[in-house]
Amino acid sequence: MIAIYPGSFDPITLGHLDIIERGVVLFEKVIVTVMYNPNKRPLFPVEKRIEQITKCTQHLPGVEVDSYKGLTVDYAKLRKAQVLLRGLRVLSDFEKELQMAHTNKTLAEDVQTIFLATNKEYSFLSSSTVKEIAQFGGSVSHMVPENVLRDLREYYR
């Protein structure tokens, strides 16, 4: 079974990586898909995010990294994926993600959404939090993979 793990991943965090690592145990392939979000102003271009994700997932068999501009369910159909993989940190994530899962179901009845609760050590973690802390010179070494940490230091120096 193929799962799509969509997101902006700007940047990828250890929380995202945790979901990917657990996803490869459950699915034969996990396609981490950098989605274009017109409502966000990205720190890193899509190509850089693909590079970051590829580097920190290279040790994981069954992971592919891609990007897509459009509806996630259309991409899932294009890639013949049966599952959208989503991580949940807190209750407010569940409310938003459940609404999106129901919407996606109306667009693609054969694509299921599977939720994985994040490990508690990552329940506070978001890309936005990482960027805010890094912007002001705080340490994010416990929040992002090493290659992303280097990119953030370079960006904010």
From Swiss-Prot:
Would you kindly state one Gene Ontology biological process term found in this protein's UniProt entry?
A: coenzyme A biosynthetic process
Quickly give the catalysed reaction.
(R)-4'-phosphopantetheine + ATP + H(+) = 3'-dephospho-CoA + diphosphate
Q: What class of enzyme is it?
A: transferase
**Primary localization:** cytoplasm
- Name any cofactors this protein relies on: Mg(2+)
Q: Does the keyword Metal-binding apply?
A: no
Q: Does the keyword Iron-sulfur apply?
A: no
- Give residues annotated as binding substrate: S8, K40, T72, R86
Q: InterPro entries per the record?
A: Cyt_trans-like (IPR004821), PPAT (IPR001980), Rossmann-like_a/b/a_fold (IPR014729)
| EC number, UniProt record | 2.7.7.3
Task: Specify one Pfam family.
Answer: CTP_transf_like
User: What cellular component terms from Gene Ontology apply here?
Assistant: cytoplasm
Record-listed ATP binding positions: S8, F9, H16, G87, L88, R89, E97, Y122, S123, F124, L125, S126, S127, S128
Pathway(s) it belongs to: Cofactor biosynthesis; coenzyme A biosynthesis; CoA from (R)-pantothenate: step 4/5
Alphabetized UniProt keyword annotations: ATP-binding, Coenzyme A biosynthesis, Cytoplasm, Magnesium, Nucleotide-binding, Nucleotidyltransferase, Transferase
In this chain's numbering, which residues are marked as the site (Transition state stabilizer)? H16
Q: What does this protein do?
A: Reversibly transfers an adenylyl group from ATP to 4'-phosphopantetheine, yielding dephospho-CoA (dPCoA) and pyrophosphate.
Q: Show the HAMAP family listed in the entry.
A: PPAT_bact
NCBIfam families for this protein:
coaD_prev_kdtB, cyt_tran_rel
Q: How the protein assembles, per its UniProt entry? A: Homohexamer.
What the record says about family reads: Belongs to the bacterial CoaD family.
Name it. Answer: Phosphopantetheine adenylyltransferase
